UniProtKB/Swiss-Prot annotation:
Organism: Variovorax paradoxus (strain S110)
One Pfam family in the UniProt entry: DUF179
GO cellular component: cytosol
Residues annotated as transmembrane: none
Gene3D superfamilies: VC0467-like
Family designation: Belongs to the UPF0301 (AlgH) family.
Annotated protein name in UniProt: UPF0301 protein Vapar_4617
Record-linked InterPro entries: AlgH-like
């Protein structure tokens, strides 16, 4: 089979860990890829809550959370890189309806597919006051792959890939996200062999 000359781009896709994944960080994980190019990939694990919730996080950064319904939401372990740094995955918030390319926040990556990832504190300040995006996932740390690293892991069948569905991120209970992501491929976890790709 001839190699495809176009570089692989899995931006706005889920990486779903195969059952045999031995790395504890990524075992049974679903990673939302925010960026993927020939230089590497960056994503956030969306189904590994940390031991703190948003109420605790906001207290740590000295912000009063005026939206109590957000307080119990978990802060996620986005990955093993920069685990003290916050990353907020959210639905788009625009300065003007007629200028959707302009984000409200100081440091926001617009992800093709309709989501945004913000790393500046202003998004948390907006959430604290009751403004800001309605649908959010807050994580500490992120997941990163160097040039060719993700492609190599895909070739080893470490991951399944599927186009991302924001409903899995924002509207699905944490403990169901792995299975829901697999269902996007028409698969069920119990049918997958832990030895896939290692015959």
């Amino acid at each position: 089979m001839a190699a495809d000359s176009a570089p692989m781009n899995l931006t706005h896709h889920f990486l779903i860990a195969m059952p045999g994944m031995e790395d504890k960080t990524f075992n049974r994980s679903v990673v939302y890829l925010c960026e993927h190019s020939e230089r590497g990939a960056l994503g956030l694990v969306i189904n590994k809550p940390s031991d703190i919730n948003l109420k605790v996080l906001f207290e740590k950064i000295e912000l009063h959370l005026s939206r109590p319904e957000l307080g119990d939401a978990p802060v996620f372990q986005g990955g093993p890189v920069q685990t003290e740094r916050g990353f907020v995955l959210h639905e788009p918030v625009f300065t003007h309806a007629e200028k959707p390319e302009e984000s409200v926040y100081a440091s926001t990556m617009t992800i093709p597919g309709g989501l945004e990832m913000t790393t500046s504190k202003d998004v948390l300040e907006a959430l604290a006051t009751g403004a800001g995006p309605r649908k959010v996932l807050v994580s500490l740390g992120y997941s990163a792959w160097g040039e060719g690293q993700l492609e190599s892991e895909l070739a080893e069948n470490s991951w399944l890939t599927v186009g991302a569905d924001p409903a899995v991120i924002f509207d699905t209970p944490v403990e169901q996200r792995y299975d829901r992501a697999l269902l996007l491929l028409g698969l069920e976890a119990w049918k997958l062999s832990p030895e896939a790709g290692h015959a």
